[in-house]
Amino acid sequence: MSKMFETLHMYFQYPFVRYALIVGVLIALCSSLLGVTLVLKRFSYIGDGLSHVAFGAMAIASVLNITNNMLFILPVTVVCAIFLLRAGQNTRIKGDAAIAMISVGALAIGYLLMNLFSTSPNISGDVCSTLFGSTSILTLTKGEVWLCAILSVVVVAIFILFYNKIFAVTFDENFARAAGTRANAYNLLIAVVIAVIIVLAMNLVGSLLISALVIFPALSAMRLFKSFRSVTISAAVMSVLSATAGILISILVGTPVGSTIVAVDIAVFLVSYGIGRITGR
């Protein structure tokens, strides 16, 4: 046990390890807050589609040699989030068809561009890191950490500020409309915030594993609690603890950060599911 703590203490002497833990906790908190809303509104598929869009945008940013690629990826992902939300309300283009079209197209174009215009000698490694977050969170600069921190604070502030409206739109959108709530505006706000979370989470778990970071804590909390507030708070706690444990385990064992965090999330869900079955929840 003492050797384990000595190893962790040694690693935490390096700034990039501290940056990884800070960003991991912030992203886990943000993703869990909106994850409950996405699951209840059946918007989970939007997160998966936007993660592929973010991958394509990252490929374009690398081709254009954009230094801070997050400033390019973020607006592109937000625009696509708005489009997907509008597509879901379009009777001609079904929402699931639009998401499948955009996600697969963005993934294919992104990989094609990385092969055609890549300046890196290790394309496979770059793609693996982008898709699964194997090393990208360990290469964060101080500027990127500050950007993640600022965006995370904005996301949490938006959720707290509009909590009642988000709650109303989540549980009964038709009633919320009848009560005078601008449901379309708040659905748009949710989509934009999710786009921001997707971009932030790419460095943590990679574009293919982002949905797990959003969905698993919410599902785990729903097995144990019933009220929206309790589920949201417990999902946030589970997500932060899972991210922290995943990062620490990956440091000690040498496993990929993103996959380890998702594995911990899965373990927490299985435990929650078992407790829910035993208690009859």
Task: List PLM regions with ranges.
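Helix-loop-helix "hairpin" substructures at the membrane interface of multi-pass membrane proteins
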Residues: 140-217
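Transmembrane helix-bundle core of multi-pass membrane transporters
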Residues: 7-10, 103-160
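Cytosolic-side transmembrane-helix boundaries in multi-pass membrane proteins
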Residues: 255-262, 266-281
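Membrane-interfacial amphipathic/re-entrant helices at transmembrane-helix boundaries
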Residues: 1-29
